[in-house]
């Protein structure tokens, strides 16, 4: 049976974590793919996180202060500091809890187990899961051309990668329902193999064994476009939750 071992990390008090977010998810869903913030700027705000790139060109993983770009052809690249992003979520990762997991845990089961470790489901939580996976299924999306189509349509042309048995790290955030329209409620995770040769947006996995680290975040710093045109014409009164579920999961 799957086993769990939980430990408080050393220290008298839980470290304070904050999240820096570039853009809003409903704008991305509507097709606002033009990059607004340079990766060099993003790296000053966090060492762990996820997102996408200008024109929706692949999946972003920020791990140990290094940025990686998983493109639709499966190649992993290192973006330049001048590369831009329309949407990203990063944090200076200082975990307060460490949890050992084993026994063939699926992504869905993992979410239930992690929820049980949280003080409640209305907190913002960053997490890292490093270990060996029996199977890992990820995706990436090709760069888009104007006029941009909505994200749901763009993901119909996504590349899906069945990585099989591998070692690596899942980086993600668990957001409360009250972020609807701004971020992704629930779980949003990206993956990078230990050899930095494959990864992407997590669709499914089965974990053999690994270490989960959790950081509760008490602040969100939201950075919005200042050019005046990026969000122009987007209907933010529209409920896009169904689109989000289909595009992200």
Model feature map: region roles:
Residues 184-192:
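Histidine-centered divalent-metal-coordination microenvironment in nucleic-acid enzymes
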Residues 193-235:
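A hydrophobic, small-residue-rich beta->alpha segment in the mid-to-C-terminal subdomain
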Residues 70-117:
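A glycine-rich, hydrophobic loop/mini-helix early in the fold
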Residues 1-2:
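Bacterial N-terminal signal peptides that target proteins for export
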Residues 24-89:
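N-terminal low-complexity or amphipathic/hydrophobic leaders
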Residues 108-173, 180-182:
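Long, positively charged binding patches that form subdomain-scale interaction surfaces
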């Amino acid at each position: 049976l799957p086993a769990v071992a939980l430990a408080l990390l050393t220290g008298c008090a839980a470290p304070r974590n904050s999240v820096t977010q570039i853009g809003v998810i409903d704008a991305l869903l509507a097709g606002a793919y033009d990059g607004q913030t340079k990766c060099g700027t993003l790296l000053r705000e966090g060492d762990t996180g996820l997102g996408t790139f200008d024109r929706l060109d692949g999946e972003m993983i920020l791990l140990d202060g290094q940025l990686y770009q998983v493109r639709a052809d499966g190649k992993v690249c290192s973006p330049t500091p001048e590369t831009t992003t329309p949407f990203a979520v990063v944090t200076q990762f200082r975990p307060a809890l460490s949890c050992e997991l084993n026994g063939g845990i699926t992504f869905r089961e993992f979410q239930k187990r992690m929820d049980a470790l949280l003080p409640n489901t209305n907190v913002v939580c960053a997490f890292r899961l490093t270990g060996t996976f029996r199977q890992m299924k990820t995706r990436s999306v090709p760069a888009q051309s104007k006029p941009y189509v909505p994200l749901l349509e763009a993901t119909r042309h996504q590349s899906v990668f069945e990585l099989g048995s591998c070692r690596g790290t899942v980086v993600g955030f668990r957001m409360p329902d009250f972020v609807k329209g701004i971020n992704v409620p629930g779980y949003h995770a990206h993956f990078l193999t230990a050899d930095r040769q494959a990864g992407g947006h997590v669709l499914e996995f089965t974990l053999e064994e690994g270490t989960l680290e959790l950081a509760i975040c008490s602040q969100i710093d939201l950075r919005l476009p200042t050019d005046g045109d990026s969000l122009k014409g987007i209907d933010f009164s529209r409920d896009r939750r169904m689109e989000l579920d289909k595009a992200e999961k």
